[in-house]
Design a protein with these regions (language model features):
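Adenine nucleotide-associated cytosolic modules
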Residues: 1-172
Length: 172
């Protein structure tokens, strides 16, 4: 049987491949950015993923979301992406959370799943800020992705709360 990561292994050392295999990435928001990110991360050989989204597909998603198809209309985005990820890598450890994450749930989800990295691809500002605050306090690396019509932005690195907006309440 051919090693499906053979081409990836040409790019990375054994140590780097082991780091990927042992890493856990949590992606919240599986629409225009999150659906592509989830698939690309799975194809890189990540060992464990937690994918979170409470939304279901509707026809208007088809122009911009990887897993939005006629056959997936009305189905939860995390469930659909999970099937696709498992088709790519049947050995991946995959946690599926079918939930719109309220700000007060962010801390619980981080404690429950304990990811090494978080990719925030949600649209709502208040939960987005809570993910940023929680990850900063827990020293979890976070990347923030956001789209709005005709533009997209991905922010990584040392993001400060003041880079976004002022937060009305800080918890924990």
């Amino acid at each position: 049987m051919v090693n499906w990561l053979e081409r990836t292994e040409l790019l990375f050392s054994k140590e780097q491949m082991d780091r990927l295999k042992n890493a856990h990435v949590l992606i919240v928001g599986l629409g225009g950015i999150g659906s592509f990110a989830g698939e690309f991360i799975a194809r890189a050989g990540i060992g464990k993923m937690t994918i979170i989204d409470g939304d279901v597909f509707d026809p208007t998603n088809k122009n911009r979301q990887l897993t939005a198809l006629d056959s997936t209309i009305g189905i939860n985005k995390a469930v659909v992406l999970a099937q696709r990820i498992k088709d790519i890598n049947p050995d991946i450890q995959l946690n599926i959370v079918e939930e719109f994450v309220l700000p007060e749930r962010v801390w619980e989800l981080l404690d429950e799943h304990q990811p090494d990295y978080v990719m925030d691809c949600i649209d709502s500002v208040t939960p987005k800020l809570e993910w940023l605050i929680a990850c900063k306090r827990k020293k979890i690396k976070i990347t923030i992705g956001h789209t709005n019509g005709n533009w997209a932005e991905v922010i990584k690195g040392d993001i400060q709360i003041t880079d976004m907006i002022l937060v009305p309440t800080l918890k924990k």
